[in-house]
Amino acid sequence: MKIVKRILLVLLSLFFTIVYSNAQTDNLTLKIENVLKAKNARIGVAIFNSNEKDTLKINNDFHFPMQSVMKFPIALAVLSEIDKGNLSFEQKIEITPQDLLPKTWSPIKEEFPNGTTLTIEQILNYTVSESDNIGCDILLKLIGGTDSVQKFLNANHFTDISIKANEEQMHKDWNTQYQNWATPTAMNKLLIDTYNNKNQLLSKKSYDFIWKIMRETTTGSNRLKGQLPKNTIVAHKTGTSGINNGIAAATNDVGVITLPNGQLIFISVFVAESKETSEINEKIISDIAKITWNYYLNK
């Protein structure tokens, strides 16, 4: 009889823990949903706290266009090839004037308008930290195109992330960007498993490198980082579309925020099909990050 009572007590304790946790997450969800009210956009959110194990998701069934957020999984696929010995950080790649496509975001093109030779490490740095489109396509060519990235994701059981087109293809046709999509929780899972290095996804050198260049991201200062204290550590990757007929297909930021108490917030925010201004789209993301920061810091 005592054993039965103990089992019942354990089950009751577990039940109330789950109810309490869900109630807490629901409270955060309500705060975020207040930000989303009356916004003329489809907004997807996934948040996971490393200590609390709370999971929050909003509009998770929608396929959000990633734009340059895709450079994070592309970089992981390249690093995987480096770890296998098929490529190396020091390997030099010639970039010709023909590679420097017009009308695309590229610090490489700005710095080396006549072409140059860079190491794979340097190209990865440009591609992730500075979101270089030309660097992205060069890396894709090195590993065999988008199919290789998809195979990497599938082999490591990352579902609900699709990468079918490179930057050049996306720039030629507005609708092509929708072939590169993710759900918020799928992107968050990629962040979490990479950060935890689940199943030794990367070697130590590659692991340290990807998080270094994610922390050094120069784009999107008004998004996840926008309203956080100045010295907050945020390792993140942004994604931004153009505007067509008054609609911005994608204003995104995904990453890992480190709280002063050491807790980690894994967060993915996608703002799609927005008729709002670029400033409002970015503020949606920074508002969500700030609310989440305050919520977990003051629990």
Curated annotation (Swiss-Prot):
Which region is the signal sequence? 1-23
Residues binding a beta-lactam, per UniProt: K71, S131, E167
**Gene Ontology terms for molecular function:** beta-lactamase activity
Keyword Hydrolase found = yes
Gene3D superfamilies membership: DD-peptidase/beta-lactamase superfamily (3.40.710.10)
In the UniProt entry, which residues are flagged as the active site? S68 (nucleophile), E167 (proton acceptor)
- Any single biological process term in GO: response to antibiotic
Instruction: Alphabetically list the UniProt keywords.
Output: Antibiotic resistance, Hydrolase, Signal
The UniProt note on how this protein's activity is regulated states: Inhibited by the beta-lactamase-blocking agent clavulanic acid.
What upregulates or represses it? Expression up-regulated from an upstream promoter, Pout, associated with the IS1999 insertion element.
Q: Which residues form a coiled coil?
A: none
Q: Which PROSITE patterns match?
A: BETA_LACTAMASE_A
EC numbers for this chain: 3.5.2.6
> Which reactions appear under catalytic activity for this entry?
a beta-lactam + H2O = a substituted beta-amino acid
Q: Which family does it belong to?
A: Belongs to the class-A beta-lactamase family.
* Further details from the record: The class A beta-lactamase family has a specific amino-acid numbering system, sometimes called Ambler or ABL numbering and often misspelt as Amber. A multiple sequence alignment was used to derive a consensus sequence and then the consensus was numbered taking into account insertions and deletions. This allows use of identical numbers, e.g. for active site residues, despite differences in protein length. UniProt always uses natural numbering of residues, hence there appear to be differences in numbering between this entry and some papers.
| Described function | Class A beta-lactamase which confers resistance to the beta-lactam antibiotics, including penicillins and cephalosporins, in E.coli strain JM109. Acts via hydrolysis of the beta-lactam ring. Has penicillin-, and cephalosporin-hydrolyzing activities.
The name this protein carries in UniProt is Beta-lactamase VEB-1
